[in-house]
Amino acid sequence: MPGLDGAYYWIQVRSLLENSSLAFSDLPLVIYVQAGIARLLNDIPSAVRISDAILPALSAFPIYLIARRYPIRLLPAVGIAFVLLNPVQLFFFTGDFIKNEAAIPLVFLLSWILLSWDERGARSRYAMAGTTILAISFSHFGTLLLTLMILSFWLLVRIRQKQIKIRPLAIGIVILSGLLVVLMLALVVPSRFTRLTTFISNPGDIFILPAWRAIFYGYANPVIACTIILCQIGSILLGVIAWKIRSTFSISEISVVWSSLIVAFVLSSPIIGIDWFNRLAALAFVPLAVSGILIFAKSLTVSQRSLIGALAVITLLASASLSLRGPTPPVLSESRYSDFKEFAKTVDLPENSIVVASHGMEFLSSWLLATDVASDAYYETSCLSSYSAIFLLIDKHVGVASDKPSSAGASDKPATSGESDKPADSNKKPVCKNQIPPEGAKVFVGNEFVLVQVR
């Protein structure tokens, strides 16, 4: 499993199958799907890998439904290729952001529902949209944010086109829906609720260390840098063409086109802080793909379609060139992972223990040692007083680090298992102050790793 967070899903599925609960508090829908596959196969790692391969490909179905509305023979195939071969899908989400990519087909499905909004009765369209949004709400927080942005701008365009009248009842329904989403996060995933309240109370944090600086100074993820350039240029180019041919769109089409373009442009803005940008910009290709399909289908001239086609081709070429970099590296090489597995067999931890390890290694540690874990990045601010013993996993070659950092950026996973309803938050004052002593008892020593007891 590539990336830093691949083993995270193994732990979650195992905990769900064995304990009927998650090891880390999280939105559960995708993990429930993985657990169902694991029960059928009796193989958790294979189940997670299968979900990582198959769930994103489900986007092909709603894309086909969107594109087949227009009499252009190859449009469905080109639209599907643009999405499934997008470098974000292939190289950024794989392994680390499985929940993101698994929820993306639902966003495409919602776009199709909005596109055909006026073709259905009120009961049918509200039921379909509500069910889809509910499924997204239980899949991934970032994808839910994308969905709410699309819906908000879609609603504004519909109001401007006088297709929706503002009524007290409608306003009440919107407010109630928002409160229900917030309540769901507070009850199901307290850590996500904490992040939401932190964002609301400190909205300026989203602009700290803007992405353009990362690109300018050369430390930006190549996939993300590519996403910024393509999404910003693509949004402007498609917006100009859409404005020129605006009279050819139906109300349903123009509502989806403008809302999708605005969201794609906002999410890929280089002024967003790099930590947020790694999560938000990666989703921008979804609304960009939807708007691109609709604008291409309605374009009036060969030159307009050529420009849109060129954008799609450049995206696919970027995908091909990035593939030469190889897959996202795993936390450990095969040989070092084999050594770590042998090392884990020699470890016998006492009850009520926790292992502190570098990001990525904490998930592999939990998987192989069957214990609670914490990331070393949050060690000093995590309250671990309830544990009888604390161990620190050290790599003999690089201290607490792993082989090679993932290109995915910072993790959005909870910092500590076992007490996942009380996640550590680096923006808050520490509840407990933990100090790593200069020397500890080396209780387990392997060829590559050492386990030190610090308390």
Predicted features and spans:
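Extracytoplasmic
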Residues: 13-17, 310-386, 435
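Signature aromatic-anchored transmembrane alpha helix within multi-pass, membrane-resident enzymes
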Residues: 172-176, 296-324
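Membrane-interface helix-loop-helix junctions at transmembrane boundaries of multi-pass membrane enzymes
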Residues: 121, 161-171, 236-263, 268, ...
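Membrane-embedded helix bundles of polyisoprenyl
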Residues: 10, 30, 34-39, 51-70, ...
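Extracytoplasmic catalytic/substrate-binding loops of multi-pass membrane glycan-assembly enzymes
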Residues: 1-12, 22-36, 331-339
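Aromatic/acidic, Gly/Pro-rich catalytic loop(s) in extracytoplasmic/lumenal soluble domains
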Residues: 389-455
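Hydrophobic/aromatic-rich transmembrane helices and adjacent perimembrane loops
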Residues: 100, 145, 273-301
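Transmembrane catalytic cores of multi-pass membrane glycosyltransferases
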Residues: 5, 25-27, 98-99, 103, ...
